């Protein structure tokens, strides 16, 4: 699943947690704190689509992010 948010310079994608933890991947990690919905996610810039991509381990986490930040 991937969501491109209209008017925002990013897209949101779901990536299995096991894939996020690959040591061969180098990404910046940040902590998202939205009240009780604090989640870990991964950020990468995709040159092909020229957007920042936020990777989440579950669809639910991605949707929570989309609902909060697509406003």
Where do the protein language model's features map onto the residues?
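Short glycine-/aliphatic-rich beta-strand segments at the starts of folded cytosolic domains
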Residues: 1-18
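Short, conserved charged micro-motifs
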Residues: 20-23, 62-64
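Acidic, low-complexity, intrinsically disordered interaction modules
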Residues: 21-51
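Short, compact, well-ordered microdomains
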Residues: 45-71
């Amino acid at each position: 699943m991937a969501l491109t948010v209209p008017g925002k310079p990013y897209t949101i994608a779901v990536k299995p947690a096991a894939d996020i933890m690959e040591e061969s991947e180098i990404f910046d990690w940040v902590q998202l704190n939205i009240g009780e919905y604090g989640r870990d996610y991964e950020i990468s810039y995709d040159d092909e689509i020229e957007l920042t991509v936020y990777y989440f381990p579950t669809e639910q986490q991605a949707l929570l992010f989309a609902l909060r930040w697509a406003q």
